[in-house]
Amino acid sequence: MPSLNDIRSTFLDYFRRNGHRVVESSPLVPRNDPTLMFTNSGMVQFKNCFTGLEHRDYTRATTAQKCVRAGGKHNDLDNVGYTARHHTFFEMLGNFSFGDYFKSDAIPFAWELLTKDFDIPKEKLLVTVYHTDDEAAEIWKKVAGLPDERIIRIPTNDNFWMMGPTGPCGPCTEIFFDHGPSIWGGPPGSADEDGDRFIEIWNLVFMQNEQHPDGSMTPLPKQSIDTGMGLERIGALLQGKHDNYDTDLMRSLIEASAHATSTDPDGPGKTHHRVIADHLRSTSFLIADGVMPSNEGRGYVLRRIMRRAMRHAHLLGAQDPVMHRLVPALVRQMGAAYPELTRGQALIEETLKLEETRFRQTLERGLRLLEDELGHLPEGSPLPGEAAFKLYDTYGFPLDLTQDALREKGRKVDVEGFEAAMAEQKAKARASWSGSGETKDAAIWFDLAETHGATEFLGYDTEQAEGQVLALVAAGAETASAGAGQTVQIILNQTPFYAESGGQVGDTGELRTDTGRARITDVKKGQGLFLHFAEVVEGEIRQGQGATLVVDHARRSAIRANHSATHLLHEALRRALGDHVAQRGSLNAPDRLRFDFSHSRALSPEELAAVEAEVNGFIRSNGAVETRIMSPDDARALGAQALFGEKYGDEVRVVSMGTLAGSGKGTDGQTYSLELCGGTHVSRLGDIGLCVILGDSASSAGVRRIEALTGEGALAYLNEQMKRLTDVAAALKAAPAELVDRVKALVEERRQLQNEVAQLRREAAMGGGAASEAKEIGGVKFLAQVVQGVPGKDMPGLIDEMKARVGSGAVLLISDTGGKAALAAGVTPDLTDRLSAVTLVKAAAEALGGRGGGGRPDMAQAGAADASQADAAIRAAEAVMGG
């Protein structure tokens, strides 16, 4: 009995002998078709070959293509485990011709392989053809000798294939195996065709026409062939089984599940084992192809499949995670044919274990709630929609998981009630969002989010991807297209562009379609949508088009460096200043970073230098930057820093950097920086290059702000500083190494000169000013003098000199500084108990139009607007003294 691995090899070897290139399976995430969630047929990777957009160095190909059907219109999830032939993961064997051979070769190839290489009895086979395809019918008669009653003409679209509303299309012929009258069912096209007697095993599509938008159809210049045969189905047939799950490959996985759960593979838990075996394949291959569990897009479908399998493991009595323990059995069976499975084994096992560990507690709570709800219901009645919605909203149970759990109990869910509860929640969210102060056209984003769901972000793994234009918004309204010069917001099904959040600015780059090109100038996020702000620079961008999306690599790299440096800076500040340091805000732009943190005082130059040195030390260490997805509680248990006041969902992205013995953070207790973060980061710390702190300033009360540069920006800054240093050295005629001593000498020289100048000014003022002889008023000597151009800062020294001249008494000095007056008064210490300099200077200032004045009893100063009435000011001071 041939194994499935043998059957796969036989198929590929047959077509290799017949001039076909054996092409390896494409990934489950389509490279060139953004309209598909997953690769679901063999022709997906050849789509552009069929349409003429791509030309390869071969015209004949054969593949064993891995496929997933678990979302959209191709969704087999609900039936998996309960039927003989439904799978989420399957292999599609196919042969293809791109303008090379056609029906007269494709049909003989199929017949020869089935009847000779696979040794299927000819009398067990029959075929269908499109009702007008006389050519195919005649070839079947000639090649296989089939009578008319075993060539069934089908008038429906079951036998006419179309790539889409327009494009290549053509009739197809399907080959069926007859299990005999002991199995119920009728031939294709009959009322009993859904029975299991006649099973389709191979479909041959003849691409011979092109469908036009007006509905007309014309012959293709080059006719092509696309065939598909499910390996699991042909394997069951060749192994004499009526159930795909009884084939050798699936049976080995079922037995591995039974062994891991200590249960009978064919006992009461038979269905559970079948679900686990199927879902093990789809989850493992999806993870190997780069899909990780998340709450949106492909990651959400993966999570649904995982959780469905995990629920069935729970029903088998498993108390600990099971799925990851089955991966080695899968690798043994399929690793040789698909090396990516072997390469990704460690990641697959870790991801499955983490997801099952997190989901187990949620699952147990959810199932208890489900049992409680059922306990209050009459036997056989459906679960109310409100209860199903609570399971979904509170415990993360998708509706199909609840339906699956109830299916075993013979119950259903009130789906209409569930949808009503969902609609009510959306209405509340809409009302809340509309009243949150957003712009007047905010409702359109809510509508688009409801229609299209969240945008899937691909940017952690790539800077270039294919996407589909779901919507265009201009001036607050949807539009079908946008032409050159227009600015629009573009909604895509998936994107590599990062949307502004967490202090990191949005990406920029380019979007290209078959009809136009747009420059992406910013990306923001709203209601789970990524809003791509764009300017159409060429041609036209249309809704529904596929698009090539390219992020500005240099700009993204600079942003990554700044963001990763911010994490290092945060940790270095905590270590230098204390655990009270917490992030209060940040900006990670391409040209700089800014980090706000809780701290009450300015940092000293020595502290800043130490922080900068520590950051650069870790940059030079070139340690790996790693990210993991986990629950917020698990992240905090590992010591991860969270943003103050931020609300987190049921899973977070944790970024770790650097190694520091005894840090107490991370799984090994030796992680330097560990933070919750959804931003993009460098792969290794050395990619940051360099970090230069520009300075520390106050942001608000109790919050300091550090600004810094990294990478090329930091290098450019240092080069500019060096240039300035060189220019200063040249101006001072000194070597750069001598500058500090040279500047110190200049400062000291300047200080001495300033002192000399001040002394000369005082001497000039005292010698050249309008002076009066000291007079005696009320028994006290009084000396007044008017000078020119003496600044207020030099006047206290002159007052001291005047007091020395009188010995005992009071003095007044008035300086004309460009029409304005600076005044100073002094009283010798022996008289301050009788007379105050403050009183004297205020009286003099008022006479010159000034107000106020202050100081000490022995020395006071004031200012006034008019120095021309100096004599009046002197008389006013004399009057105060009693003169």
Swiss-Prot record:
Entry keyword set: Aminoacyl-tRNA synthetase, ATP-binding, Cytoplasm, Ligase, Metal-binding, Nucleotide-binding, Protein biosynthesis, RNA-binding, tRNA-binding, Zinc
Co-factor requirement: Zn(2+)
InterPro entries: aa-tRNA-synth_II/BPL/LPL, Ala-tRNA-lgiase_IIc, Ala-tRNA-ligase_IIc_anticod-bd, Ala-tRNA-synth_IIc_core, Ala-tRNA-synth_IIc_N, Ala-tRNA_ligase, Ala_tRNA_ligase_euk/bac, DHHA1_dom
EC number: 6.1.1.7
GO molecular function terms attached to this record: alanine-tRNA ligase activity; aminoacyl-tRNA deacylase activity; ATP binding; tRNA binding; zinc ion binding
Organism: Cereibacter sphaeroides (strain ATCC 17023 / DSM 158 / JCM 6121 / CCUG 31486 / LMG 2827 / NBRC 12203 / NCIMB 8253 / ATH 2.4.1.) (Rhodobacter sphaeroides)
Protein name: Alanine--tRNA ligase
Record bears the keyword Cytoplasm: yes
CDD domains, per database record: AlaRS_core (cd00673)
Pfam families: DHHA1 (PF02272), tRNA-synt_2c (PF01411), tRNA_SAD (PF07973)
Catalytic function, reaction form: tRNA(Ala) + L-alanine + ATP = L-alanyl-tRNA(Ala) + AMP + diphosphate
GO cellular component, one term: cytosol
SMART domains, per the entry: tRNA_SAD
Domain of life: Bacteria
Binding, Zn(2+): H563, H567, C677, H681
Cofactor note: Binds 1 zinc ion per subunit.
Classification of source organism: Bacteria, Pseudomonadati, Pseudomonadota, Alphaproteobacteria, Rhodobacterales
Entry similarity comment: Belongs to the class-II aminoacyl-tRNA synthetase family.
Principal cellular location given in the protein's record: cytoplasm
PROSITE patterns hit by this protein: AA_TRNA_LIGASE_II_ALA (PS50860)
Compartments where located: Cytoplasm
Name of the top EC class for this enzyme: ligase
Transmembrane segments: none
Encoding gene (name): alaS
PANTHER family: ALANINE--TRNA LIGASE, CYTOPLASMIC (PTHR11777:SF9), ALANYL-TRNA SYNTHETASE (PTHR11777)
Domain notes: Consists of three domains; the N-terminal catalytic domain, the editing domain and the C-terminal C-Ala domain. The editing domain removes incorrectly charged amino acids, while the C-Ala domain, along with tRNA(Ala), serves as a bridge to cooperatively bring together the editing and aminoacylation centers thus stimulating deacylation of misacylated tRNAs.
Its biological purpose: Catalyzes the attachment of alanine to tRNA(Ala) in a two-step reaction: alanine is first activated by ATP to form Ala-AMP and then transferred to the acceptor end of tRNA(Ala). Also edits incorrectly charged Ser-tRNA(Ala) and Gly-tRNA(Ala) via its editing domain.
GO biological process annotation, one example: negative regulation of DNA-templated transcription
